[in-house]
Each structure stands twice: as structure tokens, then as C-alpha cells.
Amino acid sequence: MVFQPISEFLLIRNAGMSMYFNKIISFNIISRIVICIFLICGMFMAGASEKYDANAPQQVQPYSVSSSAFENLHPNNEMESSINPFSASDTERNAAIIDRANKEQETEAVNKMISTGARLAASGRASDVAHSMVGDAVNQEIKQWLNRFGTAQVNLNFDKNFSLKESSLDWLAPWYDSASFLFFSQLGIRNKDSRNTLNLGVGIRTLENGWLYGLNTFYDNDLTGHNHRIGLGAEAWTDYLQLAANGYFRLNGWHSSRDFSDYKERPATGGDLRANAYLPALPQLGGKLMYEQYTGERVALFGKDNLQRNPYAVTAGINYTPVPLLTVGVDQRMGKSSKHETQWNLQMNYRLGESFQSQLSPSAVAGTRLLAESRYNLVDRNNNIVLEYQKQQVVKLTLSPATISGLPGQVYQVNAQVQGASAVREIVWSDAELIAAGGTLTPLSTTQFNLVLPPYKRTAQVSRVTDDLTANFYSLSALAVDHQGNRSNSFTLSVTVQQPQLTLTAAVIGDGAPANGKTAITVEFTVADFEGKPLAGQEVVITTNNGALPNKITEKTDANGVARIALTNTTDGVTVVTAEVEGQRQSVDTHFVKGTIAADKSTLAAVPTSIIADGLMASTITLELKDTYGDPQAGANVAFDTTLGNMGVITDHNDGTYSAPLTSTTLGVATVTVKVDGAAFSVPSVTVNFTADPIPDAGRSSFTVSTPDILADGTMSSTLSFVPVDKNGHFISGMQGLSFTQNGVPVSISPITEQPDSYTATVVGNTAGDVTITPQVDTLILSTLQKKISLFPVPTLTGILVNGQNFATDKGFPKTIFKNATFQLQMDNDVANNTQYEWSSSFTPNVSVNDQGQVTITYQTYSEVAVTAKSKKFPSYSVSYRFYPNRWIYDGGTSLVSSLEASRQCQGSDMSAVLESSRATNGTRAPDGTLWGEWGSLTAYSSDWQSGEYWVKKTSTDFETMNMDTGALVQGPAYLAFPLCALAI
């Protein structure tokens, strides 16, 4: 049966790029296999189904999976069905089935209308509509069947060819289910990295004390790559928290890999620990944490393109589920060797059998975090098999001949035969022992080599047959490498050096001589027989190379069997000296050394070491370059590097010295180093200090005062700030000879302090007036920068004006007060200065003061009164005048009465008594605490007071009168006067 697409493509264009989002569900071979498996399992579960559906309605309206259900299905979106038929009672289950059937019946018509509309929106052919109807029917049956058993999770990805690559399907089916125990199976099939994997598992879950504990085992089968493994897992769940641990163990060995040519593969053994948690207060927000590790030499934990040895990874992520239908999240995966990747997740969790409204309800999210709705969740494990890879042996090497035996110096050709799919890039030899013994192995081509046997080695033992054989046997190993980087097996070439009739030994005397053409190196060759006895009179041909002299001589050995050569050279390097006698050859390396530049013999200097950074003044940098013998070295490629400033052109003086000027317009310290032939030269570096011009430029410098006005109190200060800048715009630090000169009233200037960007001092004074201050450096007066500071008198209360009198401020005025009593405070000897202050009273409204310093008393006071004048120009300065009255004065009436009546009226007015004579007047105006002495005639303050006589008392029974106009006391009887009452306060 062939399933046809049920709708056509939807083309979406965005920003000039075309992106196809498939609306078509086309089941391929994998889906057909899965359907068949589900149908077979369905037959076995029919009995169980009848048990749970015994009381259900016999006919349930099918729920159609139409094309509209998949219109929003993009790659990596998941449709999840979680139906738990075994967790509820029969009555509850029947009610749920009926309710679901009603919901499905209500939505079926809409689904069919959308499905039909999608089909008619296609090409319009009748056959396409028919095929789509068949596809709808199949989808309807699959979904209805899945709704009956367990939990299914489908992840369908469709590419432009309608294949199901990177798709997956998992299904958990409960076989035995009770309130506290669940036995289930889980079937899964998936496609990832072009591999189809089948997962078969069984498990149990049990509920104890609010925790769900589970064990499971899985068989994982890579159907495409023929890999098999078994998995063991454990679970521990509770509300809002899920913990899991899994182990994975391979069941098959190495076999050819389908991912890499020339590689084998097998499952990697490993395991993981997983945790998923959700916030009870905010169940929409969840987090995950996973640790996984696998063992092996080349394990593809981060994909087949990132193979690692014993890799591990830690994954941390957060997710947010605003409604049950949608989950978004981000995972950060970090592994070995700084491997990391970020995964953004968008998951559609469509629960088949539930209304669409419930899946868009935020309040439904909390229930999905509880055990009641999660006991049928799929097992949390890695269903994809992690693979380990191993390089295959694809190149085979053989050597011809495989063994060589000959005399010293004999030459043999060695041929390499290589079998492999790719051409040979090189043959790698392990021939260090042969080369060290004096033999050579020279390539003629990639696979052909000339081998020259080394000298024969003689041992010192008397019986040395076996030792000689061992000492002159060499085992050379070779392996071939093709252009793909593949290496062959190692092949061994056995080399035996036969004993010659004569032997040659060499000794070098004076090696490492200078290559000056004068100093010689002596090489002595000793010729001996097979027993090591020196042979005299043997002709030895000695040759040299690399331009040495002589280049060839023939010498006869002396009585000690020694032939000598003394060679010189003007070319440094290795000179090979070779001696030959009767077919025997012996070579030895000699070394001529040309003097090389030496940092410990060379010097670097800077003159001068401190200059002004004006871009004109220069420090001369000089290098004296010498070799190891202390000789000057001219003509070298010398460069100076500086960390600051500009280095001029280097001049070679042809005597081993090199110099260049260094200038700068930037302040700081320049460090100069040397390079020779582009490489760092370790001669000690030198430093040059670029400073500012010590003479400040008036046009660029600045001079400021923090405030131009201060009080002449010796405390308030103004801060002077001088910023000296030279003509190049540089701040001058460490300035010497700086002072601030003054002209005007005398002031005190503190010592000058250097700040990071200025020079500061403070000014205070005690004399009012103006002073001008000018910065001066030595004899240079910067008159254009001078500033003026004005010193003002300290605010002072100088007098109290009371009814024509000016009282001193220290006499405690007033002691007596009355309604509408007024006086004026005088600031700085003139009431005209009162407007320069802000006035306030501490006892308002009884005592008030205006902006002229006029104080008015409207009612009696009960404590000390403070009248404060705050300077408007210097708000931090204020002056307060304080007084504490002790008598409140009041006229007992406006009628003339007798002394007895006056006493009665004062007492009747709640006054203590008639004012005592001693508190009434002394006959003179003075701040003496008497009423008339302080205030004079009270008629000047209010019309409530009358001119004439007022009763006062000398004693409690002896009365006399006081004239309000003159303040005079009149003794003797008086018949009528005004009452003058007083209340102690």
C-alpha cells in the first residue's frame, strides 16, 4: 500500500530568501514498518483493551488527523500523546472516553473541512484528493489506536523530497498497571545522521511515599550500521523533579564503518546522569542538568567530525512552558577539550485526545509536573548509539630484498612494494642505528633507496665471534604512508655487515676551528688488521669536501698505522673527511666555525637618556655589534624597536657600530630593543625618558580659583589650581620653582601640592578686601593668568535698636516682654546690611522677625528664643541672638483705679500681681532688666498703653506709681492710676 502526500508545499519568502515549510506528511518505508509493528502489538493487546473499554460506548467517533494538523509541523516539532487508560477507575475511564469522543466528534467536522480545503487548494486532480483521503484515514486510525494505549511521542521532519530523515517515534505501553506498580514496554524508531535505529525496552515503576522509582533495560539496534548495544537505567521521580541514570554497553565488535572510509566502528560504552526540575511556584519554568561520559580512543560524542578519547560532556539548560502546547528552551553543552555547543529548542507538545483550549490554558501546565500525569512519561535516555571508530590497515608494505649482508661501504638497492588504493606519499624509515654507525640510506625515488653499509665494528673481547655478529647486525623498520595519510604495516629489513680484511678508525684533533683559512683541524686515520694490529706503509686516499684544503691527498701510514691530514677552510659548517684503503672507507665530520654575533660581546646605548618630548630633540641610539671573538661585525641587518616615539633611519658606520635618532611628542619612557636579521637580539635594552618642557606656556596653561569670594575669618578658603602645560601641550610634572605671588590684602597661601594633573594650594585671610594671585615659575611671572579673590567681613551682630536706644548684644535684653513689643537687630554696624541675611525665629508665631531684622513679640514665651541671621552670600555662616524673658507685662485695664482695685484686676486677669517697682524702672534707659529701662514708654508700641501714672508696688502692701512717659517713680499716696500687671514666665 502506498501512502500519497495529503497536501502540497507552502512557499514562504522572507528577506529575499525562499524557505519551504512542508505541509505534507508522506510516510516512507520506516513509517510503514512502524505501523505494522503497532498493528501486531495491537492484536496482542486486544484483550487488555477490551478490559478497559468494557463499559465504554461501542462506537466512538474517529478523530481525523487532517492536513491542517500538520500545517504547523516544522522540523524538530513534537506531537505527543499521553493517554493513561490504566490509572483511573472504570467509571472515571468511561466518563473520560465519552467526553473525549464528544470532543473528537465536535472537531471532526472542522478537521474534515480543513483537510478538504487543503486538498482542493492543490492541483485540483481527483486522484490527489483520493490519495489525500486515504492518508487522512490512515492518520485517523494511527491516532485513534495510539490514544488507546500508553504514551506516544512523534518527531517528524520532512525535507524537500518528503523523506523522514532526522525523524523519530517512541511509544510507551503499560502491560500491568496498579495504583503503586507499573510494568511497561517502550518501542522507538528514529533516523539520525542517515542511520535508522530501533529501540526495544521494558521496565517497571513503583510508587512509594510520593516517589516513583523505576528500572528499565533496552536493546538498541542500529539497523543501518549494524551496531547493537544494551542499556540499563534507573529512575527516581517526584513532583517537579525527575532523576535518571543510564548505562550503555556494546554487544558487537569492530566492523567497517559507513561514515569513514578506511575506518571501523562499534558502539561506545558509557553512561549518563540526568536531572529535570521545575519550580513549584512557577511550574512553567524548568531546568535540566546532564552529565555523560563514554570510553574509547575515537568516540563521536560531539558528532563524527569531532572524535575524542574518553569524552565527557555536561549539559545545562532551562525551558519555559507558557502553555502545555508550547515549550521553548536553551541548552549549553560543554565537553572535553573546550568543546561546546548551544541548542535552542522549540517543542510543540500536542496531546491527542485533549481539547485544543486545554492545551492553550496556562493553568494546565502545573498538572504536567506532577506524578499523576507523568508516570507514563517516556524513559529519559540517549536512544541514539554513540559510536567509537578505529583506523583500518589499508596499506601493505614489503621490501626487496628483505635481508642484506655485505662488506662495509658496499651499496645495495632496496625496493619497496606497496599495495593500497591510494598512491604512496613517502616511506618512513627507522634507521637511526644504521646512520649512527656510519651507514647511509639515500632515496632514489619514492620507493627506491640506496643503502651503504657502515664500517665493521670490532669488539674488545678476545673471543668475539658472537659479539661481532651482534654489533654488525642492524634491523631497519619501514612503513608506507599514502596520500590519504594511511599508514601501512611495519616491515623489517635485516642488515649484516661482514668482517673486512682491514679496518679504518678516525680521530679528530682541534675540531671547531675558526673558518679563517688559517687554523687547521687534524684528522688521523688508523689502519689495522682484523685483530686490530696497526698496519704500516698502507696507502690511504683522503678526500675532503665543502671547500676545504687540501681536497685530496694520498698518505702512507706510519709505524703506528696512522695517516694524517691537516685541513683548513674559509667556509663554516661541516666538512666531511673520508679515507679509503683497499675498498674500506671511513668518514668523519669536522666543524669549522665562523664567528657569530654575540649579545654578551655587544653593547647598546642611548645618549642622552632624558629629553623633551617635542618631536625635535633626539636621543641617539647606538649599537656596537661584535661576534663571539669580540670582533666588530659590519654589514648586518640591524633594526631598533621602541615602545614609544619615532625611530629614525639606522646608519651603518662600517665599523661595527649602528646608530639612529629617537624622537617623540608623547611623554613616557621608551624601551629600545634590537633585532638582527629579523630575530630578537638579546643585548640589554636601553630606556629613554621623554619629559615635558619645564617652561610652561601661558597660552596653554590654566590657573583657576575654586571660589572668588571668601570670608576673612581665617578659616574659609579658596583652592588655587594651576595646570602648567608646555608649548607641545604636555602637562609638566615634577615642576621646580613654582610659587603663587599675592598683591592686595594679606592672605595665607598653603604649600603647593602636586596632583596627577595640577598643582594646588589653599588661600585664607583675616582682613577684608581684595587680593590678586599670580603663578610664578622661578623668575617667570605668568601675569596673564592672575586671579582676584575678595575677602568679606565675618557676619557680626553689633547692636540692638530699641525705641531710640542702641543696646549691646551681651546684656541679656530683653527680660521683660509684652504684646507688640518690637526691637531691631543690627548687623555689621549698619541696619542697611540686614538685607544681606535671611532671618528666622525659633519661637514663631509668638516671636517673629522680618527681612529687616525687626523682631516683634505678639505673645508670651515659655523658653529661650533664638533669632538667626544667615548670610546669603556665605550660607554656611549664620549668627543667632538668644534671649530668655522672665516677665510678661500686661495692662490690667484702661481705667484709672485705686491701688487695691489695680491689685484685684491684676489677679483677676490671671496675673500674679502688680509689677514690682524694682522691675518697673530705674529711671534710666538701659538693658538692666526693668520694663521702662529696656523699652522706654510703652505707648510707642501700642495704643493699648496710656500716658500717665501706672501702679507699681514696693512691697505687697505698699504701692507707688511710675510715670510711663518719664519712667519716674512717685512716692506717696495716689488715689487713681492705671494697673501695671506682671506674670513670671
From Swiss-Prot:
Cell location: Cell surface
Chain segments carrying region Integrin-binding: 795-985
Region named D5: 887-985
Region (D3) location: 695-794
GO biological process, one term: cell adhesion
Extracellular side: 494-985
Disulfide bonds: 906-981
Keywords: Disulfide bond, Repeat
GO cellular component terms listed in the entry, alphabetical order: cell outer membrane; cell surface
SMART domains with a match to the protein in the record: BID_1 (SM00634)
Location (main, coarse): other
Classification via InterPro entries: Big_1_dom (IPR003344), C-type_lectin-like/link_sf (IPR016186), CTDL_fold (IPR016187), IAT_beta (IPR024519), IAT_beta_sf (IPR038177), Ig-like_fold (IPR013783), Intimin-Invasin_domain (IPR051715), Intimin/invasin_bac (IPR003535)
D4 as annotated region, ranges: 795-886
Name of this chain's protein: Invasin
Species annotation: Yersinia pseudotuberculosis serotype I (strain IP32953)
